[in-house]
Amino acid sequence: MRTLNTSTMDGTGLVVERDFSFRILTACFLSLLILSTLLGNTLVCAAVIRFRHLRSKVTNFFVISLAVSDLLVAVLVMPWKAVAEIAGFWPFGSFCNIWVAFDIMCSTASILNLCVISVDRYWAISSPFRYERKMTPKAAFILISVAWTLSVLISFIPVQLSWHKAKPTSPSDGNVTSLGKTTHNCDSSLSRTYAISSSLISFYIPVAIMIVTYTRIYRIAQKQIRRISALERAAVHAKNCQTTAGNGNPAECSQPESSFKMSFKRETKVLKTLSVIMGVFVCCWLPFFILNCMVPFCGSGETKPFCIDSITFDVFVWFGWANSSLNPIIYAFNADFRKAFSTLLGCYRLCPTSTNAIETVSINNNGAVVFSSHHEPRGSISKDCNLVYLIPHAVGSSEDLKKEEAGGIASPLEKLSPALSVILDYDTDVSLEKIQPITQNGQHPT
C-alpha cells in the first residue's frame, strides 16, 4: 500500500489504488448481501422444521419451497460469482457450465415459486370452499414439483448440451460474448432462441400471471373491505340506537363517519401490500431480463446496437439475485414466522411485544349485536382461530359476486352466519397471510 501511495504521481498507481478500493467495497457489499440472503432463508427453513404448526398450513409449503430456492441461490450461485467479481476473472475452471445451470435453475425456481404463491392466494379468496377441498398437501407438492421440474428442464439440459450458446460469427468471436468477456469470466453468449424462450418461461409469463392474480386479489379485497365497513356501520349504528334509547332519547341515532375513513385506510393497506410484493419483484428482475433479451441481438458493426457494458449487465444480475434476500421479509414475516424467529434467535423474552386493543363485533342467535374488547400482544394470533381480515363469507366466489350484482346487493348482516365474529384490529397491517379460506361455520380449518 505504501508503494501505491508513493507512486500516484504517474497516474498508474492511482488507478491501481482506486481499483483495489473498489474491489474491497464490492467484497463488503456482496458479502453482506450473501449473508443476509443466507440468514433470512435459513431462518425460514429452520422455523418450519422446528415448529409443527408452520407445517400444518398448506400455504406455507409454497413459502418453504421459495425459501429453499432462494437459499440455493445464496449457496450455489452468489458466492462463486462474488469471488469472480473480486478477482476479476473466473478462477473455478470447468465448474463454469455447472454454475451457469445452477444459476438458471435456482433463479427460475424462485420466480416460479413466487408465481405459484400468487395463484394460491388468488384461489384462496376467490373460491375459499373449493380451495379448502382441493388444495391438499398432495396438490401443493404437485405444483411445487412442476415449478422445480420446469426449472431443471430449462437449465441443465440446454446448458449441458450447449444448446444455450450462440454460434460464433467469426473465428475471433469463439471465446468472446456480446458483453466483451472471455471464457475466463464464465460468460457465454446466449443464442437468440434460448434467450427469448427461457426469459418467457422464467420471467415474462410468471410476471403476467402475478399481475393478473394480484389485481384480482385487490378487487376482491376492496369489495370485502367495503362490505365489512357496511357491517361495522350497521353494528355501531345499532349500538348507538340502543344507547340513546336507554337514555330516553331515541331520536339521536347517527351513522359513524369514521367508518368510511377506516374503509379507505384498509383498502390503502391492501394496495400498499400488493404494490410492495409486485414492485420489489419487478424492480429486481425486469432490468436483467430486458438486457438478457437484448444482448443476443448485439450487432457487430460500428454502432453495435443492443450492446451494453459488462459492468452494467453484472449490476443488474446482482439486482435479480438480491430479490432472494428480500423474499423472506415479504413472504415469511407474518405473526407466525415472527414469533418462530424470535424463539430461534433467543430474543422472545428480551423483546416483549406491545399490546393492541381488539374490539370484537358479533351477532348472536337472536340477531342482537354484541360488543366485546380485549388486549392481545401485537402480532399474536388467537388460540381459537386465526384472525379473519378479509372474509370470504362476505364476498363468496367470483360467480356469487356476479349473481349478487345482477340481483341486488343484500344486507351485510344477511351475509353473516350467526356465530361469525369480525375482528377489528385497526393497527395491524394487511398481508397475504391474512387472506385465508374459512369453513361454513366461519372458522379456519384446523
Swiss-Prot record:
Database matches in SUPFAM superfamilies: Family A G protein-coupled receptor-like
Residues modified by glycosylation: 5
This protein's UniProt keywords: Cell membrane, Cell projection, Disulfide bond, Endoplasmic reticulum, G-protein coupled receptor, Glycoprotein, Lipoprotein, Membrane, Palmitate, Receptor, Synapse, Transducer, Transmembrane, Transmembrane helix
Transmembrane segments: 24-49, 61-87, 97-119, 139-163, 193-218, 273-299, 313-337
InterPro entries: Dopamine_D1_rcpt, Dopamine_rcpt, GPCR_Rhodpsn, GPCR_Rhodpsn_7TM
Ranges in the topological domain labelled Cytoplasmic: 50-60, 120-138, 219-272, 338-446
Residue pairs linked by disulfide bridges in the UniProt entry: 96-186
Coiled-coil positions: none
Entry-linked PROSITE patterns: G_PROTEIN_RECEP_F1_1 (PS00237), G_PROTEIN_RECEP_F1_2 (PS50262)
Domain of life: Eukaryota
Pfam families: 7tm_1
Lipid-binding residues (covalent, S-palmitoyl cysteine): 347, 351
Gene Ontology BP terms: adenylate cyclase-activating adrenergic receptor signaling pathway; G protein-coupled dopamine receptor signaling pathway; positive regulation of MAPK cascade; vasodilation
Name of the featured protein: D(1A) dopamine receptor
Organism whose genome encodes this protein: Sus scrofa
